[in-house]
């Protein structure tokens, strides 16, 4: 699993060192990663062949000509870049992706299980704060639902 958060600096050629743990997880038919504009946030999404296969599987399940299939093909497959690791474990981010997300200096690489994201550092800090608040609220709601379900279940057991 891609885990943890790392801050890395882009060099003048838009190269970043990919954390060793991430390089090992991305191992597959080629020595590198697949990257594309995320469809859920303003960042680059990346991963190994398993992530590519997962998105491709979702796309293949949709009928040819389905508007969602076309949107996913354009957004994911059309925006995807196959980025190979150099001998120092770096990838060179495409200029188009750097321009799209304002990646010019420091970036944040965030592990999300089966994938990772590359963010402009300040944009990620704002995103992380919003996600923490959403997680807090969601967890509180989930706990309330679980308590209500336990109470309802225990109430049904004693009514009979």
UniProtKB/Swiss-Prot annotation:
GO terms for biological process: negative regulation of DNA-templated transcription initiation. The keyword Lipid biosynthesis does not apply. The keyword Cell inner membrane does not apply. Keywords: Cytoplasm, DNA-binding, Repeat, Transcription, Transcription regulation. Its main location: cytoplasm. GO terms for molecular function: DNA-binding transcription factor activity; transcription cis-regulatory region binding. InterPro entries: MraZ, MraZ_C, MraZ_dom, MraZ_N, MraZ_sf, SpoVT-AbrB_dom, SpoVT-AbrB_sf. It is found in: Cytoplasm, Nucleoid. GO terms for cellular component: cytoplasm; nucleoid. SUPFAM superfamilies: AbrB/MazE/MraZ-like. CDD domains: MraZ_C (cd16321), MraZ_N (cd16320). Belongs to the MraZ family. Forms oligomers. This is Transcriptional regulator MraZ. It comes from Phenylobacterium zucineum (strain HLK1).
């Amino acid at each position: 699993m891609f885990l943890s958060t790392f801050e890395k600096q882009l060099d003048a050629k838009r190269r970043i060192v990919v954390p060793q743990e991430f390089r090992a997880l991305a191992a597959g038919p080629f020595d590198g990663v697949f990257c594309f504009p995320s469809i859920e946030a303003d960042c680059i999404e990346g991963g190994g062949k398993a992530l590519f296969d997962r998105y491709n599987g979702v796309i293949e399940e949709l009928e040819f000509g389905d508007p969602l299939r076309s949107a996913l093909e354009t957004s994911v497959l059309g925006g995807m870049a196959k980025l190979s690791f150099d001998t120092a474990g770096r990838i060179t981010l495409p200029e188009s992706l750097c321009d799209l997300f304002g990646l010019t200096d420091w970036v944040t690489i965030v592990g999300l299980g089966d994938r990772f994201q590359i963010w402009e550092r300040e944009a990620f800090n704002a995103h992380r704060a919003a996600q923490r608040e959403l997680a807090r609220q969601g967890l509180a709601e989930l706990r309330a639902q679980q308590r209500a379900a336990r109470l309802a279940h225990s109430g049904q057991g004693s009514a009979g």
